[in-house]
Amino acid sequence: MKWIVIDTVIQPTCGISFSAIWGDMKMIIWYQSTIFLPPGRIFTPVKSGIILKDKEYPITIYNIAPFNKDLWSLLKSSQECPPGESKITNKCLHNSCIIKICPYGLK
């Protein structure tokens, strides 16, 4: 079964991400991984993680729930990454970010 990423929210201080996805139905997944799942990305879940572009990546999925518009709005409003000022300076202002490669291309 293939899943399509609709949107992703990252919490850089803890490395946790939330993605709204479409599979058989619209869902929200809560996970931790070293990869970023941007909107439009298509992947296949497997027991040990996910397959993305014919390569397997480890991923820890904490929860999968049916999509809830109110919950997604709450997650989006509490999003720490990327902060608005970063778009102007192209520099990440999060001193406590644990993500090694910024998915937004910030330095």
Swiss-Prot record:
Q: What is its main location?
A: cytoplasm
Classify the source by domain of life: Bacteria
Entry keyword Cytoplasm: yes
Gene3D superfamilies from the UniProt entry? 2.40.50.650
Cell compartments where the protein resides: Cytoplasm
Note the InterPro entries from the entry. Anti-adapter_IraM, PmrD_sf
Any single GO CC term annotated in Swiss-Prot or TrEMBL for this entry: cytoplasm
| Record's keyword annotation contains Zinc-finger | no
Keywords on this record?
Cytoplasm, Stress response
One biological process term in Gene Ontology: cellular response to starvation
What functional role does this protein have? Inhibits RpoS proteolysis by regulating RssB activity, thereby increasing the stability of the sigma stress factor RpoS during magnesium starvation.
Q: Which family does it belong to?
A: Belongs to the IraM/RssC family.
Its recorded name reads: Anti-adapter protein IraM
What is the species listed in this Swiss-Prot or TrEMBL entry?
Escherichia coli O7:K1 (strain IAI39 / ExPEC)
* Lineage, opening ranks: Bacteria, Pseudomonadati, Pseudomonadota, Gammaproteobacteria, Enterobacterales
Task: Identify the coding gene.
Answer: iraM
